[in-house]
Amino acid sequence: TPRTSSAASDVYKRQTKTLHYWKMNTWSQGANLTEVRGGGTHLHPQNPNTKLKDNLFSMDGPSIYKIARKKAYKMVINTFKETSFNREDVSWVVPHQASLKAINAYHEYGRFDKEKVINIVENTGNCVAASVPMAFVTAVKDGRINRGDLIYFIGTGAGLSMACALITY
């Protein structure tokens, strides 16, 4: 099985003119679906009763997708309820590149134009937390995203955690 590993970050200077909205939530629902069971004193790596798989990331993708899709939909709805913007104002959506199915959900369920949702997963795979900044930089470098564009970032993480930001680039 191919594995990907990467790291990336984007640095933004806080300016009231450009950061329009930011939100992060964590829910315990589904926490057992994305976790590393080992570590600490409970399943210490050197404990003879600890198995190798206890110290590896474990995920039930289909189950966590169902929960994350519903939570993401609510986060999208709340973003536009809590701001003066609407979906049509968004130039580009830069989502976590979890899977093609997850990316397409921003069009199907989030009701964003499919052409406005940045998709690099077919070239990079799921690079976990690095996928959002990687997708952003890719779209800037290839000329899709330009200064003045309204960008909606949204990402998920184990736990289940989710964050979004609405910025003018």
Language-model features: locations:
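Claisen-condensing/thiolase-fold acyl-transfer catalytic domains that form or cleave C-C bonds
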Residues: 69, 73, 91-169
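Mobile, glycine-enriched helix-loop/loop "lid" segments at the mouths of ligand-binding/catalytic clefts
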Residues: 19-51
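Conserved hydrophobic/aromatic beta-strand scaffold that supports enzyme active sites
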Residues: 9, 21, 33, 164-166
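Short helix-loop capping/hinge motifs at secondary-structure junctions, enriched
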Residues: 14-18
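Short beta-strand segments
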Residues: 10, 23, 153-157
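Single conserved hydrophobic/aromatic residue that forms the stacking wall/gate
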Residues: 1-8, 12
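Conserved active-site "lid/cap" helical segment
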Residues: 39-91, 101-111, 135, 139, ...
